[in-house]
Amino acid sequence: QSQPVIDTSMMTAPSKDITEFHEKFAKLVDNVSQVVVGKEAPIRQCATAMVVGGHILLEDNPGTGKTQLARGLANSIDMSFKRIQFTPDLLPSDVVGITFYDQKHGEFEFREGPVFASIVLADEINRASPKTQSALLEVMEEQKVTVDGVTHDVPQPFIVIATQNPIEQLGTYKLPEAQMDRFLIKTSVGYPGHQVSVDLLRQVNIRDRAQTVSPVLAGDDILALRGIGERIHIDDNILEYIVRIVEATRHDENIAIGSSMRGALALTRCARIWAASDGRGYVVPDDVKDLAVAVLSHRIKLTAEATFAGLTTDETISRMLETVPVPSLGA
């Protein structure tokens, strides 16, 4: 079957903006790589989400370096950073803040919660009660907090990096599917390779690697990179390819609930940044493929049969990508 051809003559040439983007993005990834060694793919995915301005969900087993990765990212960018350790008894007011009566001045005052920072690390988000989870997830969507009828804006840029252990662990509350959709990407760190593990053990004097990195970018740099990313050319054939992938999630026999348009929009925004981070002014199909699992796997729900058969959402998306026809690059 003949596949649509992408007209490369329409593509934007790499300008000084794209060169600047490539250099700054690489600097950020290299800096975080000092904290989480040998994990370039998840670091690039997280950095992409930060530039887009989306939220990140890191899901992996205990001790794989989720919090280290999150703190490494936060410490690499000169922006306000707060960490919330989620526990079953944490209240929504502990996250967003409270209004209290100031007896000295005789008036009500608002005391900001830890969510008022540019980068918020929500550690072990699935250990908190659904009510507290909802409080954070509302801020993620609305970018503002309403307490006692008064609305307070959070700082910009505003990015939540949440970590969670897989559901098999005891004492956890599963994030609802609708709220999972609020995260731009979901990725995992995985255990380090053999040689990296040996090298880590050799460095006996470093207790906390995230503390050793210093900022290489400012908050304004992130906003500037976001502006460049929005000008990256994306061909209609690539847009159709993205829509075909998302539509395929709705017709797959193993998937009970497919991805919404939010997934297609997220994939488009991420692909632009991924292309620019590669030093290109245009998106190619591989950009979409590299990101599809991280962007879409948490937006779908498998059928009971597929789950019982041991399939994972990541495997399902990967296998599905092989069946969707890829547009070829024309000369």
Which residues are covered by each model-predicted region?
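C-terminal engagement/docking regions of AAA+ P-loop ATPases
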Residues: 2-15, 19, 251-331
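Pre-Walker A (pre-P-loop) alpha-helix and adjacent loop at the N terminus of AAA/AAA+ ATPase modules
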Residues: 18-64, 243
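Conserved alpha-helical scaffold flanking the Walker A/P-loop in AAA+ ATPase domains
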Residues: 44-48, 101-121
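Walker A/P-loop
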Residues: 47-87
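AAA+/P-loop NTPase substrate/partner-engagement loops
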Residues: 76-104
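Conserved AAA+ ATPase core "coupling" helix
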Residues: 92-96, 172-244
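AAA+/SF3 P-loop NTPase mechanochemical coupling elements
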Residues: 109-118, 147-164, 175-185, 262
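Conserved AAA+/SF3 P-loop NTPase catalytic/coupling segment centered on the Walker-B
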Residues: 114-141, 155, 170-180, 191-199
